Amino acid sequence: MFTGIVVFLIYAVVAHLFSYYFKKNRVLHSQKWGLNICCGKTDGGGVNADIVQHKELPNFRLVEDIYNLPFANKTFDCVLCSHTLEHVDDPKSFFSELERVGEKVTLVLPPLYDLFAAFNIFEHKVIFLTFKKEHHSLPLYITLPFARTLHDKWGQLNRA
């Protein structure tokens, strides 16, 4: 029993590190992004935009409403949205807005094999039903059980 728990925890940690650090960074550094939306502390090489400025980044734009971005239609050839859709109230509307401002949208999402990220009810509102990290369309998703109740009562750990 104890050995099984240890093996599970080792798997979960290794899968999370592989998914979040290796695979995410591989996508981020694969090209220069016209728009890196909800950029956090990462520089995508073009316009970096977020609802909060986490650190000094080149070409940073503060965005007030992710569902109504301050850019004209098809302003950007390529848009990167990494580890954000799982935090928002309405992933479909946000994805539609990304498609409006970008020719090609790339989503980086927590895959199901990354158990720590995929089932994180303290930060995430939805779980994407995918084993892939990178997407160009919105995959199927479901609302995480108890996440909204938890966020309403005690707040969301990381707000998007």
Feature locations, PLM:
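S-adenosyl-L-methionine-dependent methyltransferase catalytic module, highlighting the catalytic core
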Residues: 92-160
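N-terminal membrane-anchoring alpha-helices
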Residues: 1-26
